[in-house]
Amino acid sequence: MKSIILSCFVISAAASQSYLPTEQIDVQSSLLSDPNHVAGKTVDYMIAGGGLTGLTIAAKLTENPNINVLVIENGFYESSEGEIIEDLNDYGDIFGTTVDHAYEIVSQAINNRTENIRSGNGLGGSTLTNGGSWTRPHKAQIDSWEKVFGNKDWNWDNLFPYMQKAEIARPPNDVEIAAGHFYNSSCHGTNGTVHAGPRNNGEPYSPIIETLMDSAKERGVPTQLDFHCGVPRGISMIPNALHEDQVRSDAAREWLLPNYKRPNLQVLTGQFVGKVLINQTATSGAIPGYKAVGVNFGTNKNVNSNVYAKHEVLLASGSAVSPRILEYSGIGLKSVLDAAGIQQIVDLPVGLNMQDQTTTTVGSRTKPSGNGQGQAIYFATFNETFGDYAPPAHELLNTKLHQWATETVARGGFHNVTALEIQYENYRDWLVNEEVAYTELFLDTSGKINFDLWDLIPFTRGSVHIQGNDPYLRRFSYDPKFFMNELDLLGQAAGSKLAREISNTGGMQTYFDGETTPGSNLAYNADLDQWVDYVKQNFRANWHAVGTCSMMAEELGGVVDSAARVYGVEGLRVVDGSIPPTQVSSHVMTVFYAMSLKISDAILADFHAKSSKH
């Protein structure tokens, strides 16, 4: 196998702050699209996926000119149906285009419906398709990754500096502060890579946000806080991942464009990584060893090639795809692999522990006096969400954990009752003792009072598994098993009920001009049971799935260790959103960027340790 120094071309890194759409489209012509340029060759690190984590890690590794990296991405730099939607206010316009994977889930038992999971397909991944919300989780949640799940050094104090390192924060101006923003400079980074600041289209801000905060204060809810300091709670406006000119700050713009002029970085687009190439190494007793040596990639079973990795293969294809690559490679549950006709080499609970959230909408019209731009988040605690229904909800937490774990394992969402009960006990501790945010109510005031809301801490566990042995047919079962846990359904219903109440109480009555969703479809005095019935038929996925290649101790159900290395296979890591062992009370971009930087340091430490031995 021949080693190659990989190269490509880029416009000046100095111009990375402000690209015109035409300049962005020209980037694609500078990337590789012919697989023959890399087929049969060897690089130091092969990254499967050019999304948020893949591009971040590629940029960090290639800061060392002696490290050669190849990124293989299924998508391209821009959509074949038009350039990326740069205005975050219009992000939904890209759904259904070639930049949206639109994974179809299996029919859900709760309502016999299927839907598409929105996920970015292109360089930048879901940073091309999301709404850009920029928040961070609760300290206790990240601390549990070490304390509960055995991931050494994965705690708030260690991850927080990486969150700051990723960020170029733009403080709010006086007008934005008056509208409801708050900024604590000690919680932000200013010398990072991803731009984050207030969304501001130049129009006046709606008075609704300030009024909502005033009403919340009367109920003892904290307001106008910085949700980046480790305790997201209450109501405030938030920054978004965007430049000062309001252009999207996506992973391709910030991590690829300034760097792919490097002679040691190459990006191949329009190709799908099907499986990892794994060799058996020396046997230790009765247990054989295995090492990842490359990947097979292509477009179909008749048109595919191998490329080899001298050091490591890094899977960065996301929570829906990375577990499938592992399974096609012989890593996973025997029952799944046998059914697919694949020889198992390593037994790990790949594809289990999927944790996605569910979304409902409560929307109303505003009187003209309430018009204006603005978005805010209410991070509501468990008690705030349930209100008068909190006592029976607590009773469920105190009496049902073992039953829920048993039922979840029986449904195929996890594989070990005892280990899952530990997860559930951790979630109960968050909700009861730490008072982490349980529900996010996302308010948009652009001529309306619109709450999109979701249960942040689902107890339901789903799965994703391959169906067949040909990765290029992309046949798989994606099953979040929404609302198979009773508390999740009750929580989504209670959050929806809360959104209706706060839309039209106190000072909000000044601007409220009639509800549109649910509107007449649900009686205004509906009780929680009626809201449950409504939610069953009117929710959607939140598209934030994590956990399908969980990072935790192997005996707890881990697929990767605290350095993101796959158990039982040398030279193979999973480095994307499939590895967080828990959900968090946050939008996940900030966590994924910090993860990427921390894992990059681990990879580089191993590289330097190996180099020093030679």
From Swiss-Prot:
Pfam families reported in the protein's UniProt record: GMC_oxred_C (PF05199), GMC_oxred_N (PF00732)
Keyword Glycoprotein: yes
Region Disordered: start-end pairs: 117-136
Residues that bind FAD: L52, T53, E73, S126, N130, G131, S133, V273, G577, M589
Classification via Gene3D superfamilies: FAD/NAD(P)-binding domain, Glucose Oxidase, domain 2, Glucose Oxidase, domain 3
Names of required cofactors: FAD
Disulfide bonds: C187-C229
Keywords per UniProt: Cell wall, Cytoplasm, Disulfide bond, Extracellular matrix, FAD, Flavoprotein, Glycoprotein, Oxidoreductase, Secreted, Signal
Signal peptide start and end residues: 1-15
Enzyme Commission designation: 1.1.3.4
Catalytic activity entry: beta-D-glucose + O2 = D-glucono-1,5-lactone + H2O2
Sites carrying sugar chains: N112, N184, N191, N279, N383, N416
A cellular component term, taken from the record's GO annotations: extracellular region
Location of the protein in the cell: Secreted; Secreted, Cell wall; Cytoplasm; Secreted, Extracellular space, Extracellular matrix
One example GO MF annotation: oxidoreductase activity, acting on CH-OH group of donors
InterPro entries associated with the record: FAD/NAD-bd_sf (IPR036188), Glucose_Oxidase_domain_2 (IPR027424), GMC_OxRdtase (IPR012132), GMC_OxRdtase_N (IPR000172), GMC_OxRtase_C (IPR007867)
Gene Ontology biological process: secondary metabolite biosynthetic process
Induction (UniProt): Expression is highest at pH 3.0 and decreases by 58, 59, and 90% at pH 5.0, 7.0, and 9.0, respectively.
Catalytic center residues: H544
Principal cellular location given in the protein's record: secreted
Binding site for O2: R565, V566
Family per record: Belongs to the GMC oxidoreductase family.
Protein purpose: Glucose oxidase catalyzes the oxidation of beta-D-glucose to D-glucono-delta-lactone and hydrogen peroxide in the presence of molecular oxygen.
Subunit structure: Homodimer.
Stated name of the protein: Glucose oxidase 1
Lineage, uppermost ranks: Eukaryota, Fungi, Dikarya, Ascomycota, Pezizomycotina
The gene coding this protein: gox1
